[in-house]
């Protein structure tokens, strides 16, 4: 009988909290040569969720890659969360995912049952998304890791980016925040299992359903809120769109338990990186609780979509989303460029 392995004990970082900080990443990519191609509509120079390559007048290829170390101990659940997180980038571009390849790192003494369970979890969520996993690559490493390289398709004039927000747009978020803080708390055994079951369910929810609804409306920009936190991804959207985002802090959904855990200091390292990256571009119109501010910088794993939609369509889109995703909320609005990229109201 194989020994049960606690996956999170094998990893220093968990989920999207392992992501290299946005500021560090920008420095690493500075000076790296890029090849221009008139068919490459979105490349890594845009800091977007995926690349977009025009195949013909009706079809563009959308590609992304995402993998990370375990955020939960259950191997099948880890596979599900990692797959949902990877596929999400395709949805954030308004595209339809179709094909994927496994990316996997395993320790030399990792039980076969655990490895197979991770793969089963990935296949399960890929199937729900309508994605075919056609193969992959596995190597030995000191820590287990899993994710997917995903390809999808979209009309070359209908894809979304994180740099298309316009003044007057309304911002909608489809999942509550606090995942990084709560998973950090769970690793330290500070949080009730019932609370974590709710968080694990959220991380396994595909953004497919939000994507299928939002493409019916006049959406100008979209990104998924993951490793850089709400303010990090908001900062990228504001910078890329040359606008200022006003976040209404009282309207931002988050798990209440994350507030008390943040007060106890259960802050993942990624939150500090995100704060260092984005804080200079953030202005606080009113005093904000430090724990709530930590939640706004908290790295999310398999987070929701942040959608910039025209004011005329915002109410109808929100109602449509809430029929399937009750936690979707309007969290802010877009204005012309001001001194700061983000205003917290």
Across the structure, where does each feature detected by a protein language model lie?
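Glycine-/charge-enriched secondary-structure boundary and capping motifs
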Residues: 2-13, 24, 110-132, 142-144, ...
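Active-site glycine-rich loop that binds ribose-phosphate moieties when present
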Residues: 149-158, 194-214, 288-290
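A generic local secondary-structure boundary/capping motif
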Residues: 40-42, 50-53, 89-91, 123, ...
């Amino acid at each position: 009988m194989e020994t049960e392995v606690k996956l999170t004990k094998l990893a220093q970082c968990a989920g999207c909290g392992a992501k290299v900080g946005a500021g560090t990443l920008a420095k690493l990519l500075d000076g790296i040569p890029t090849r221009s191609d008139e068919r490459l509509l979105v490349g890594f120079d845009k800091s977007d969720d995926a690349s977009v390559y025009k195949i013909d007048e009706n079809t563009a290829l959308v590609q992304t890659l995402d993998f990370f170390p375990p955020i939960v101990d259950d191997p099948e659940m880890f596979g599900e969360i990692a797959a949902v997180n990877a596929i999400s980038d395709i949805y954030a571009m308004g595209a339809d995912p179709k094909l994927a390849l496994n990316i996997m790192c395993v320790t030399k003494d990792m039980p076969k049952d655990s490895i197979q369970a991770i793969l089963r979890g990935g296949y399960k969520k890929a199937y729900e998304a309508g994605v075919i996993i056609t193969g992959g690559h596995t190597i030995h490493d000191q820590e287990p890791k899993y994710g997917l390289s995903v390809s999808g398709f979209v009309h070359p004039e209908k894809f979304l980016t994180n740099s298309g927000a316009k003044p007057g747009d309304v911002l909608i978020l489809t999942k509550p925040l606090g995942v990084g803080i709560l998973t950090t708390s769970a690793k330290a055994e500070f949080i009730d299992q019932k609370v974590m079951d709710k968080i694990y369910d959220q991380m396994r929810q595909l953004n497919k359903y939000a994507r299928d609804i939002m493409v019916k409306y006049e959406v100008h920009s979209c990104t998924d809120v993951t490793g850089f936190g709400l303010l990090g991804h908001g900062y990228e959207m504001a910078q890329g769109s040359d606008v200022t985002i006003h976040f209404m802090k009282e309207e931002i959904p988050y798990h209440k338990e994350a507030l008390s855990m943040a007060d106890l200091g259960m802050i993942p390292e990624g939150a500090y990186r995100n704060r260092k990256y984005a804080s200079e571009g953030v202005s606080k119109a009113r005093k904000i609780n430090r724990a709530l501010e930590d939640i706004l910088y908290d790295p999310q794993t398999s987070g929701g979509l942040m959608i910039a939609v025209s004011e005329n369509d915002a109410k109808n889109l929100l109602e449509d989303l809430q029929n399937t995703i009750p936690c979707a909320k309007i969290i802010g609005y877009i204005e012309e460029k001001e001194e700061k990229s983000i205003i917290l109201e």
